[in-house]
């Protein structure tokens, strides 16, 4: 009896190794493109973006989910690095701070040219693959970071931004965030405001992917209806398996299918199992569910490494992707489906976004209205209403001064 148990255990181990070997073989030619990694945020918190410090060496950095050896072990060939600053920068120094975070991503590429290749288009991702480098792209996480400015949007595009997450954990003057659905924030735009819709049109024209992670369901539906190009969820999971408001409900997944869009599954335990603990097979369940509802072309990976504190057992850092792929092969995912998940689906969406951009010419020029803006530190140059108010206030002050002068003479 013991011999039989040993024999079957040995067969199981061999089968497991076989699936992992198959995963590695696939990933050697189609490496992972992950949709969301917060290493730049960790570089700010740990080193104040001083990359030349000896303890900031990405070949040796031990306290993060991400470093160069782990990326190589995980067969990561493309990464959207998150340029992120929290919502408390809104109406303050958001634009300055996001420029600094984009700068640190560019400096990563300059400091480690043998590992990272900063790219800005879909064809260059494939070129980076061929050179054995990590194609490094910039995703700006939070619409508050453009300060409701079409000009800032365009400038960040020219500096390398290739997706914009419309909100983080706060509303912008033009889009509602996911906390509205939980009842923690009030709906202000009830999805997208008229300016928000114009801003999405400008994103389409530029070739900036629209990222709907962190937004309210109403914002999701507005964007999926309005966008001329497919959209992405850079780091979200399936609401049906874990009813957290950061996840994507099935009716939205159907819209994702109808628009050839993409959901890149988040590994944060609270979004996977709705608890502090989760497992690798539970992440595979989310991938299975999205594939079932939206199709194999609609699923990708957006682990949220270095942006979360709790990760599933078996997916503790970026080196673990082959184990997840082995689990999917064990579940009878085809090689074509696996390659789609790893990279091909994202490259398709990115290419379609670029194609839409090539067919759009005229930029959006009408700015957000003055009454939609907030913040006591603002100036209002260019707004005729503000100019009118300024003239009226100036005339009132002059009249009062004249009256006081006459009273003084009396």
Curated annotation (Swiss-Prot):
Domain of life, per the record?
Eukaryota
Propeptide, residue positions? 385-410
Carbohydrate-modified residues are 121, 258, 332
Q: Which UniProt keywords apply?
A: Cell membrane, Cell projection, Dipeptidase, Disulfide bond, Glycoprotein, GPI-anchor, Hydrolase, Lipid metabolism, Lipoprotein, Membrane, Metal-binding, Metalloprotease, Protease, Signal, Zinc
- Record text on activity regulation: Inhibited by L-penicillamine. Inhibited by cilastatin.
Which Pfam families does the protein's record reference?
Answer: Peptidase_M19
Which reactions fall under this protein's catalytic activity?
Answer: an L-aminoacyl-L-amino acid + H2O = 2 an L-alpha-amino acid; leukotriene D4 + H2O = leukotriene E4 + glycine; L-cystine-bis-glycine + 2 H2O = L-cystine + 2 glycine; a beta-lactam + H2O = a substituted beta-amino acid
Compartment annotation: Apical cell membrane; Cell projection, Microvillus membrane
Listed name of the protein: Dipeptidase 1
Q: Which organism is it from?
A: Mus musculus
Originating gene: Dpep1
